[in-house]
Each structure stands twice: as C-alpha cells, then as structure tokens.
Amino acid sequence: MAAATVTVEEVRKAQRATGPATVLAIGTATPANCVHQADYPDYYFRITKSEHMTELKEKFKRMCDKSQIRKRYMHLTEEYLAENPNMCAYMAPSLDARQDIVVVEVPKLGKAAAQKAIKEWGQPKSKITHLVFCTTSGVDMPGADYQLTKMLGLRPSVKRLMMYQQGCFAGGTVLRVAKDLAENNRGARVLVVCSEITAVTFRGPSESHLDSMVGQALFGDGAAAVIVGADPDERVERPLFQLVSASQTILPDSEGAIDGHLREVGLTFHLLKDVPGLISKNIERSLEEAFKPLGITDYNSIFWVAHPGGPAILDQVEAKVGLKKERMRATRHVLSEYGNMSSACVLFILDEMRKRSAEDGQATTGEGLDWGVLFGFGPGLTVETVVLHSVPITTGAAITA
C-alpha cells in the first residue's frame, strides 16, 4: 500500500485562498410592473374589494405616506389578481396559486440579475464554482438554485446552496456564506442571488391584523446578484468591495419580534414587538464587536449599507448612533425607489453606492471612505453584520451594470 506524498495540512493550505473575499460584480433586476406609492391605497382597496372599509383605508394611506417609498415593482398585476380573487381576500386558501407564480418567476427574475452580474464580471460562466440562491418567496424541489443552474447553463458540477424562508436579514447571510466559500476554496467564484416576489405575502386588509398591512405598504419585488471571489485577477476582474468579517446574532429579548408562517393562505407576516426599538437598542453592541478590533469608534467615518426594513428603523438607528443624514443616503434611496425587497435590498444598496460614488467623483466605492458596515435585520430578531472595505475608483470603474 503506497504512502501518501502530502499531509492533510498541506492539502488544506493549498485549498485556501490567500486574500479576502471580494465582490467582483453586481447586477439587479425588477419586474416591469411599477406601482407608485401615492396611488397604491386606492388601488389596493379597490382590487381587494375593501373600499367599504373607509377608516382602515385611511390608516393604510397614512402608512404609505409615512413609508418614505416613492415607488415599488410588483409581479402581481391587476389583471392577474382579478383572475385570482382568493389572493385578494384576507385569509382565503391560495397557496397553490401563489406557488404556481413564484416557482417560475423567482428563478426567472434571479436569472435577469445574474446575467447582468456575469456580464459585468466579464468572465466565462464555466468559471463559476458555487451558487448560493436565497428567497423567502415559495419553496420547491429541486429548488430555484437548480432551476437557475439550468437557465444560465452553469456546469452540472457547480456546488449549490439553496436558502429558503430566511427573511429580511438574509442579504447579509449570503455574503457571509459566500465569504467562507471563496476564502476556503482557492480559485472559487461564487454566484450569489437573492430573488424576492411578494406574491406569497399579498392579501387583503384586516382591522385585526394591522402588522400585515404594514407589509402591504412596504414590500416590493426585486432580485440582486453578486460574484464573490478571493485573490482577483486584476487584469480581467475589477474588485468593488472586500468582505472583511461577518457575524450573525439573535438580539436579546426579541423572540417573536418578526414572524412569518407559510400556510394555505400564503406567507403570513407578524410584527409582535417594537422592532425599531430593539434594533436601535442593540446596534452599538454589534458595531463595537465589529469595529473595535479595527480601532474604529467614529461611525460617521464608515459607509453604511443597512437593510431598510422601514423608515422608523433607519430613523432610530441614526439617532442612536448620531449618524449624519448622508451616511444612509444610498439606503434611503433604495427604500424610496424599490421599497423593502427583503434579502435583495442590501445588494441593491451596494450597487447604488458604488455607482453613485463613481458618478460623484469619490475616491473609493464606499462614498470616498475606506471602511463600511452592512447590516441585515429580520426574523428572530436576527442581525447580520458584515464589515466591508472599499476599493479605490479608477476612471470609468464601478459604474458598469
């Protein structure tokens, strides 16, 4: 029996990348159907045949007015909803109709975002070694990861991970997972896709479930994709952001703060506690754990990518940390132009930040700053914290989409 010529330690060393995981390209996509927030209360109460609920409509109108959202994109059109009245009821059996939509449209929208990211990356699809796909919109086997692999013509040997039902924090989760994959597999190129469609959560209004109406006022559809890899070949690859560290935590005393339950009526959404208060109360601890090792204590000196769960979360975080308004500019822009797209939001914000930084003549992809933070907030109450480092902007870089 021949003896091995290498040790396990040597194999492990050869498997690992040298440098940190890096975002190499970003692509985003939305459905064609655009809904303006100013018109939405009238539309929503008309299509759900709830116009007789005048006081509730006024409450909903105030929710929309306070949302700081200008427009959203939704796959569900008025024509489709008219043909599927159970989806417009508050609690009618409708899961089959919802599933029929999302098992097709989630990978399709993900494909549109992925194609943009791959085009910007500029490398052959055959170099993609891993696929991480995330959605809170429906479930199927084989999953959206399999469907996307087939749609894009990726190699059959691509290593896939499908993440279902994670919720709004998962934009941070996918970056954390992609970081570990890229840094522990030399030469790996990870395609990360978050694709979210609100067809699973859309339902009519109810006086007894106002937190569901909060979701109806905030949620929008969108997909985002990034390519992540370590040790980029800078002759053909253009780094955008380095992923320096990543962590996840469950906030104390937050059980039941955000819940979602997949039932015959679709995905129901529950807000049971003061979510903005819980997040703002604990945000400094997350920042200290992430940035104290780096010697950073001034949180206005870093760029911010925060999941825009709603304007109250952003307002209270700003107040707690003493942030200047411009630190949340990219975050608030995405909230205004797209609404809350769950896991896809933070990737949209990264895209907005690198583009605007280049357009404004900033020195780095992070609004001219070197270090940054990406926060995901969602069910649990779970917080994902990713420390980012920007890269210098060269002429013409960071704008491509």
Curated annotation (Swiss-Prot):
GO BP annotation list: flavonoid biosynthetic process
Pfam families: Chal_sti_synt_C (PF02797), Chal_sti_synt_N (PF00195)
GO function term, MF aspect, one: naringenin-chalcone synthase activity
Enzyme class: transferase
UniProt entry tagged with the keyword Kinase: no
Keyword Transferase found: yes
InterPro entries in the cross-refs: Chalcone/stilbene_synt_C, Chalcone/stilbene_synt_N, Chalcone/stilbene_synthase_AS, Polyketide_synthase_type-III, Thiolase-like
EC numbers: 2.3.1.74
Catalytic activity: (E)-4-coumaroyl-CoA + 3 malonyl-CoA + 3 H(+) = 2',4,4',6'-tetrahydroxychalcone + 3 CO2 + 4 CoA
Pathway annotation: Secondary metabolite biosynthesis; flavonoid biosynthesis
CDD domains: CHS_like
The family this protein is said to belong to: Belongs to the thiolase-like superfamily. Chalcone/stilbene synthases family.
Free-text function comment from the UniProt entry: The primary product of this enzyme is 4,2',4',6'-tetrahydroxychalcone (also termed naringenin-chalcone or chalcone) which can under specific conditions spontaneously isomerize into naringenin.
Name of this chain's protein: Chalcone synthase 4
